[in-house]
């Protein structure tokens, strides 16, 4: 099994990087990738016909915050990207010019009366901040001072637009705290959810607050040396019960996005039973991983050399995904956060019945 990041590289024409989402959202293309046999070119609104009655869709209900902040330490300008809230109410953040910061420094934010104290700093650009406000007042501060942290491949020379605030939110959004959107969820519309209901496909949600580390590349060529950033996740007892009941009844667990899959796998017992979860996960799924919780994955098309491309190769098979991505490029599928989607059926392991 390969341990080299370069083995997960591929050529992607820049013209295939989506700058805006499909409208309506469920008109995006969907590449159906069964465990074996030919690929099928569909659209997202075909999803109900590709699933079975009794299957359970599991979506991430995190909501994106405007996480980029323009801070000052005296006259020095410090760019801050909030990453995740910590149990004590402080925030871990990534900081440009972080080496200028020391514990005890106080940051100000132009145009607001708010401040943040620097609690600590690491050697990788990370800082821990304690803001002078919390709760609804902190949310109001972010709405006034923060900017969406759109992925760097979405070109916005003058910054994210008000339309991006709408486009970069999923229909499932309920719990604020993510830096980046769980982009597979961007394809869902009220009409699509109604069609899934009519087809007998169940639905539940979990929460994984996607952190700023999602944009970080694998440095070097050794996959084994890569360390994921921790992200906060919650699976309620109600959601765990629904997933376990669906599996007992013979339904498949369909993860909407890699974030849902990663949290489900983090919360799964060896036999696939899902336990309630409330904590951090830094799970890194790559070829060789044995899946316990998820049977089908709906996800967008990911970056070369990224941990997410490694994840889908682990899920559906390395050669299978190389072929699928080659098909997608040749057929003009749109890539990344605002792009098209694919539906992956997990590659069976030895002794396992077909899914």
UniProtKB/Swiss-Prot annotation:
Task performed by this protein: Transfers and isomerizes the ribose moiety from AdoMet to the 7-aminomethyl group of 7-deazaguanine (preQ1-tRNA) to give epoxyqueuosine (oQ-tRNA).
Location within or outside the cell: Cytoplasm
Name of one Pfam family that matches: Queuosine_synth
Pathway where it operates: tRNA modification; tRNA-queuosine biosynthesis
Molecular function in Gene Ontology: S-adenosylmethionine:tRNA ribosyltransferase-isomerase activity
Source organism per UniProt: Gluconacetobacter diazotrophicus (strain ATCC 49037 / DSM 5601 / CCUG 37298 / CIP 103539 / LMG 7603 / PAl5)
Cited Gene3D superfamilies: QueA-like
Catalysis performed (reactions): 7-aminomethyl-7-carbaguanosine(34) in tRNA + S-adenosyl-L-methionine = epoxyqueuosine(34) in tRNA + adenine + L-methionine + 2 H(+)
Subunit structure: Monomer.
GO biological process: queuosine biosynthetic process; tRNA wobble guanine modification
Gene that this polypeptide is encoded by: queA
Alphabetically ordered keywords of this record: Cytoplasm, Queuosine biosynthesis, S-adenosyl-L-methionine, Transferase
Main location, first listed in the record: cytoplasm
One GO cellular component term noted in the UniProt record for this chain: cytoplasm
Annotated protein name in UniProt: S-adenosylmethionine:tRNA ribosyltransferase-isomerase
Domain of life of the native organism: Bacteria
């Amino acid at each position: 099994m390969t341990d080299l990041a370069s083995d997960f590289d591929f050529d992607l024409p820049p013209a295939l990087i989506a700058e805006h989402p499909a409208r309506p959202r469920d008109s995006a293309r969907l590449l159906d990738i069964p465990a074996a046999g030919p690929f099928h070119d569909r659209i997202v609104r075909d999803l109900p016909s590709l699933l079975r009655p009794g299957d359970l869709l599991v979506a991430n209900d995190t909501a994106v915050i405007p996480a980029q902040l323009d801070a000052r330490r005296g006259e020095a300008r410090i760019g801050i990207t909030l990453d995740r809230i910590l149990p004590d109410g402080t925030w871990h953040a990534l900081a440009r010019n972080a080496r200028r910061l020391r514990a005890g420094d106080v940051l100000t934010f132009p145009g607001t009366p708010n401040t943040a104290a620097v609690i600590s700093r690491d050697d990788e650009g990370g800082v821990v901040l304690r803001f002078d406000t919390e709760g609804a007042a902190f949310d109001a501060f972010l709405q006034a001072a923060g900017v969406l942290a759109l992925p760097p491949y979405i070109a916005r020379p003058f910054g994210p637009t008000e339309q991006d605030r709408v486009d970069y939110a999923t229909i499932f959004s309920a719990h604020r705290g993510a830096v980046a959107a769980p982009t597979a969820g961007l394809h869902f519309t009220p009409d699509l959810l109604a069609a899934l209901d009519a087809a007998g496909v169940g639905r539940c949600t979990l929460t994984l607050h996607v952190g700023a580390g999602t944009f970080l590349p694998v440095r070097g060529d050794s996959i084994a040396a890569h360390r994921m950033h921790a992200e906060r996740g919650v699976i309620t007892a109600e959601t765990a019960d629904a997933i376990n009941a669906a599996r007992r009844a013979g339904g498949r667990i369909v993860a909407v996005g890699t974030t849902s899959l990663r949290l489900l796998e983090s919360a799964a017992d060896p036999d696939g039973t899902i336990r309630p979860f409330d904590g951090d996960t830094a799970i890194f799924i790559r070829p060789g991983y044995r899946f316990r919780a998820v049977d089908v994955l709906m996800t967008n098309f990911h970056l070369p050399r990224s941990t997410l491309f490694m994840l889908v190769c682990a899920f559906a098979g390395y050669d299978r995904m190389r072929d699928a991505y080659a098909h997608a490029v040749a057929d003009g599928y749109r890539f990344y956060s605002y792009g098209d989607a694919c539906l992956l059926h997990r590659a069976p392991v030895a002794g396992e019945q077909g899914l």
